[in-house]
Amino acid sequence: MLARGWLESPADPLSGPWTFHDDFNLGSASIPVLVVDVNRDGLNDLIVGSAHGYGLDWYEQRLGAHGERAWIKHPIDPFNSQYHDIQWVDLDGDGQCELVTGKRYRAHNGHDAGEFDGVGVYYFKWNGESFSKQVIDYGPAGIGKGCGITFAVADLHGNGRLDVVAPGKDGLYVYENLGG
């Protein structure tokens, strides 16, 4: 996966040329770019955060009648910036994955869009047509907690529920999943 397309491996990925497909332009995409079948149509889609601008989007993959590939950009959250790490996990235990992420604060000390905006940790639930935003934490820096470059999702208490561990500019925070 590259910002302007993807590489298709040959039959033997250790020898032979890889084929570049110039199918899309992800701009200043964060790392990672998630490759998941968001809408469950059997085709892999892309989920991309903007690490240094505004926006969190998913790119729906569609195939035309003759196999031509198209990528349709859908906004998930165009109103927040500095989405770095994103994870696709079943946070609420319903058997369906949610998109978990957070907004970073002052990523490059005065050089990124929205650097002084409120920070937060969120998950986005897919309803079959679009994502709905669920707030885990939000507020101005010092009150709300965001995510740094990376965060972790794990069952810290052995209760079967995934918790979120979010490092930020003002410390490390654990969000215990109380269920319900």
Explain the meaning of each model-derived region.
Residues 1-180:
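Beta-propeller-forming repeat regions
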